[in-house]
């Protein structure tokens, strides 16, 4: 098994060597820009790791891995427009650097380019791989719509929130692993166990993201800290805080959520203080650990040598240790 760093190098090299020569150049420049912003490449790495886990050649899975990364970045490009986000990985977002129309159209082309990569897999598994990829893509869009629907609602349950992040975030990690396993020659049931691993890990990852949005270092996080609080985004932290807050604390929280004429920094500081008072962060971390354990249980049922699975266990640890 190759290390995560070796697989990241293979992926980054393939991305750097990808040149979009089609016209007009303005359509493709944002794709190159966003893809070259970097990141951990966790989803394509999971494709390659899953292929290797079952004895497959990572280079046979490389096109599918790049396809997954293209799709992931397409969702980021469009999400940033919907969220009006100024930064992505510490740099201006595509719509901030160009404009919203360019971001929408370039994102559409990224989705097409992702499919063009995905259909390069071996014909014997093409149908299965495309089924997983299509279901994954639909799930991500369904999750995004659910997230947008939450904006219009005063109350969202923890159960609803977990279902939304499973679709919006976790299914892409899960689908990446299932596709990699299929390319590596895994039986369908074994590939589904990797899907289960990725799904639970993805939920844990999003919960960690919720924590970092409040408590992270913006330089290391690569995004605006406190953005979820400023926009009243329904995260696990806010939903749990609304459940737990009583009397004067509940009144103060409601005041900040309903008042649009506020100083953003003061709002972030005050709501964060409420989270601290209610020990919401510790509750999110406990929930996160629950899903990590579920992920590792699924991995334990995968029928390959334990030594091969160690790298995925390590990946899980790396995924969840994002610097604050």
Regions found by a protein language model. Give the residues of each.
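All-alpha prenyltransferase/terpene-synthase fold signal
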Residues: 1-324
